[in-house]
Amino acid sequence: MRYRTFGRTGWQVSEIGYGMWGMGGWTGSDDEESLKALDRAIALGCNFFDTAWAYGQGRSETLLGQTLRAHKGVTAYVATKIPPKNMKWPGKAEYLVEDTYPPDHIREFTEKSLGFLGLQTIDLQQFHVWSDAWADDDRWQRAVDDLKREGLVRSVGISVNRWEATNVLRALKTGLIDSVQVVYNIFDQAPEDELLPYCQANNIAVIARVPFDEGSLTGTLTADSTWPDGDWRNLYFNRDHLTATLTRLDRLSPLVPEGMDLPELALRFILEHPAVSTTIPGMRRPAHVERNLVASDGIRLPPRLGDALKTHRWNRGPNATP
């Protein structure tokens, strides 16, 4: 495992971290298997774990806390997230701060997460949704400053809305935000335009999430793919989006080098960018851990391949242009 500096915090974090969205009772997860996967990740050098209260209403945090207690003495960095008070995803400018992140709510859910994790301090507390319409509101600013001063959190980050990579820049300019978590993968390259350069220039850590585009870049997506009732991928991969995704995968697959599979290529693409501090694939089984962590070996992609992957950028979202 290789490590990178996590922005201004100075932490040395594993460049492949652990995304825990799939744990805590979501998408058919199994607690025993999840714990085995977490154990295996620690054994292989993973030390950055990203969870949230919303992942099973504390269940994912509980599993992580249980794992950390079983590995006392191991350096591990814990990142979690505060849900918006109105429990609406994504964040929108029309929502007021009192409806999303009033000070008492920020404190309440920080204390809840500390309880589920069994910790006295959270390394990285993040806003789970965001709109830059809230950036200059001093209520959330004072709240996070108080949490830092009291030692309840060490640093503060923002999880950026999907396909809205610039909808955080005003918040970053306050100087209060230590990290951003953003969707960044072979298809979703928009963060390279403004966000990643800004973070690199200002020593702000970058957590690249959704490295496999919700599963399309695992190489297992087909026209017949189905998911359990209630799994949000049924909405994400609706008929039109599924068809478009499969078409793009057909064009991408010839670029996968011999001896490498698509998931490994997807991770290596992300790690090519120097602004990225860590990427957080979801890993519910030990086999997932072993498959993903192999990409952290310092081997660079050939420049010609990197250039070819750039052509697979897919601008998506409400304001996207082809």
What are the residue ranges of the model-derived segments?
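Active-site mouth loops of central-metabolism enzymes
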Residues: W21-E32, K92-H105, A133
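Structural motif corresponding to the early beta-alpha repeats
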Residues: H71-Y101
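Active-site groove signature of glycoside hydrolases
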Residues: L114-A133
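N-terminal binding-site loop/beta-alpha segment at the start of enzyme catalytic domains
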Residues: M1-A76
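Aromatic/hydrophobic pocket-lining residues that form the small-molecule binding cavity
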Residues: S34, S60, I106, T110, ...
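Beta/alpha (TIM)-barrel catalytic core signal, keyed to glycine-rich beta->alpha loops juxtaposed to Asp/Glu
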Residues: Q57, V129-P322
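Short, acidic/polar
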Residues: S29-A41, T100-L117, R162-A171
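Conserved, mostly hydrophobic/aromatic
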Residues: F6, Y18, S34, A41, ...
